[in-house]
C-alpha cells in the first residue's frame, strides 16, 4: 500500500484540480494535487513539500477531510485529503500538464482519478 496525500485548495469558492500528464499512470485524469508520503514525514509535511515541488506554491495545511483507499490493478493507494490555503506563489506545472480552478457545479465535466472521487462527493 502506498500512502499519499492530496490538497483541496479553495479560493473564491473554487478549488484547484490538476491533470496528470502523458506517460504518468492515469494520464489525462484530474486529481487534487499532492503526492507520496516519504519515510519520517507526517501527512501535513508531505503535502507542503509535494505542493512546493510540483506546483511551486507555499501552503498552509488545514483540516483533515477523510481517507480514501482504492485498489488499482497494480497497487493499493491510501489517499488522505486535507484542506489547504496558498500562502505564496503562483501555480507552475512540472508534473501535471494542466491546472484549473473549478466550481463544484463544474465537477461533472472532468474525469477524476478513482481515489479522488470520494472527496468530490463530500
Where are these regions (language model features)?
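NUDIX/MutT-family hydrolases
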Residues: 83, 92-122
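Active-site-adjacent beta-strand/loop module that shapes the phosphate/pyrophosphate-binding cleft
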Residues: 58, 68-90, 98-100
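Conserved hydrophobic "DFG−1" position in protein kinase catalytic cores
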Residues: 9-10, 17, 84, 101
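Conserved N-terminal beta-strand and adjoining loop/helix that marks the start
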Residues: 1-16, 36
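The catalytic Nudix box helix
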Residues: 32-64, 103
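A conserved beta-turn-beta hairpin within the catalytic core of GNAT-like acetyltransferases
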Residues: 24-28, 57
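Conserved beta-strand segments that form the floor/walls of ligand-binding pockets within enzyme
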Residues: 16, 31, 81
